[in-house]
């Protein structure tokens, strides 16, 4: 499952703004986006990922995604780094 991918990844970036910055640097292998996140927040991330040809994984819950990242709050987007 995608949550496992996040928790086992060697290097991740948490959050939409930081994920966009990482995508612009071409240093992202794939991104994980929470389905229950506000589409206004995730639209820029998913659009840029599509333009860059980066795989997009969708998970159900921001809370579970945050937990997989080791943080106490939800995460709308996470980048798994190269």
Curated annotation (Swiss-Prot):
Entry keyword set: RNA-binding
Record's InterPro entries?
Ribosomal_eL30-like_sf (IPR029064), Ribosomal_eL8/eL30/eS12/Gad45 (IPR004038), RNA_bf_YbxF-like (IPR023460)
Query: What superkingdom heads the lineage?
Result: Bacteria
Q: What GO molecular function annotations does the UniProt record carry, in alphabetical order? A: RNA binding
Name of a matching Pfam family: Ribosomal_L7Ae
Family as reported in the entry's similarity comment? Belongs to the eukaryotic ribosomal protein eL8 family.
User: What is the official name of this protein in its record?
Assistant: RNA-binding protein BPUM_0095
């Amino acid at each position: 499952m995608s949550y496992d991918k996040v928790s086992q990844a060697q290097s991740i970036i948490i959050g939409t703004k930081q994920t966009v910055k990482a995508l612009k640097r071409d240093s992202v292998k794939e991104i994980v986006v929470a389905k229950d996140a506000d589409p206004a927040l995730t639209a820029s991330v998913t659009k840029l990922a599509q333009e860059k040809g980066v795989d997009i994984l969708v998970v159900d819950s921001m809370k579970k995604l945050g937990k997989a990242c080791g943080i106490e709050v939800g995460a709308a987007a996470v980048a798994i780094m190269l």
